[in-house]
Amino acid sequence: MTHSASSTPDAARVPLVLSYGQSRPVVSETAFVAPNATLVGDVSVGAGAGIFYGAVVRGDRSPLRIGANSNLQDNVTVHSDP
């Protein structure tokens, strides 16, 4: 995940990545996740993907896969029901 605490004025500004049950988001080292984005549960973010400002990705009901080089723009919410 290309986000370095040293590159932000406030080291506490990191994406909110939350487990849900036994599932935890997995983010590629080359993906960008904005500091105020939220990832929950069974979510994977592929290489070169971007999750932009205010986006929420909820894998609490079923898996969500954000493919390589995809992007989710500002303030979008992604959620899926089984």
Residues of each region from the PLM?
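Terminal amphipathic alpha-helical/low-complexity segments used for targeting or macromolecular assembly
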Residues: 1-30
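A structural motif detector for beta-strand N-caps
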Residues: 25, 30-33, 37, 43, ...
